[in-house]
């Protein structure tokens, strides 16, 4: 038996706040074939219990740099040994978004930046990403770029890694 435990690099604990997002509603029904539990938000204790049951030592929670969820930030504040943050950045939002990234990382345990190209229908090779790439290098911050076919029924060509 191994004592190794996993790090889950993409955990969403506030799905209950996303019931209004059309592509997520369609993904719930068409892709995941899920019921109403799909849009369940978790408490800190529920999330830790689920992590322990699954053998997950640490979870990286996604938080938007513009209007970050206090709920998500509280997870990291309450249990910094179990939760870190991935700062969700919009490359189309310009320098103010990058300044928000710096501020968030200065105040909270941000371990990576994250972009989801289908949200903007821009491939990662688009010049609008370049300032983000530069900022991540300056901050010595890894960048997670979502690639492959998206689960939600949205355009996915921009996430084709080939």
Where does each model-flagged region fall?
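An N-terminally biased module of ancient metal coordination in phosphate/nucleic-acid-related enzymes
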Residues: 1-62
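Active-site gating/metal-coordination segments in enzymes
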Residues: 57-58, 66-159
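Histidine- and aromatic-rich ligand-binding microenvironments
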Residues: 162
